[in-house]
Amino acid sequence: MAPPSVPLVLLLVLLLSLAETPASAPAHRGRGGWTLNSAGYLLGPVLHLPQMGDQDGKRETALEILDLWKAIDGLPYSHPPQPSKRNVMETFAKPEIGDLGMLSMKIPKEEDVLKS
């Protein structure tokens, strides 16, 4: 009779070889993790919205969806404020310049640049 350690080692090797098969690995269910999109923004897990089976609960479902979006975005209100429209001068004017007319006075003229 063989020493008891040989059958034990063979059994252990057999079990370890079976444990490494792809069929025994847990299947990945969908895209549940965090990822980056093509622009580099961090995207969270996929949000599964409740199914609307009846039209009586339509308002409650809409409120639930709004609450979900508020929780995800961290917004205290449903629509973010719209940015104000600015012209080119206002966009590139520096705060230390003050008046927008000062911006045109600080730009060097062509003849001054050519002289130097």
Curated annotation (Swiss-Prot):
Where primarily located? secreted
List UniProt keywords, sorted A-Z: Antibiotic, Antimicrobial, Cleavage on pair of basic residues, Hormone, Neuropeptide, Secreted, Signal
Tissue note: Isoform 2 is found in ganglia of ganglioneuroma and ganglioneuroblastoma, as well as in differentiated tumor cells of neuroblastoma tissues. Not found in undifferentiated neuroblasts. Isoform 2 is found in the skin, in pericytes covering microvascular arterioles and venules on their abluminal surfaces. In larger vessels, isoform 2 is expressed in layers of smooth muscle cells. Isoform 2 is not detected in endothelial cells.
Provide a Gene Ontology MF annotation, just one. Answer: hormone activity
Propiece span(s): 87-116
Provide one Gene Ontology biological process annotation.
response to insulin
Q: Record's superkingdom?
A: Eukaryota
Keyword Transmembrane helix included in the entry's annotation:
no
Q: Which InterPro entries match?
A: Galanin, GALP
**Localization annotation:** Secreted
**Signal sequence interval, chain numbering:** 1-24
Any one cellular-component term (Gene Ontology): extracellular region
Family the UniProt entry places it in:
Belongs to the galanin family.
Tell me the protein's name.
Galanin-like peptide
Q: Which gene encodes it?
A: GALP
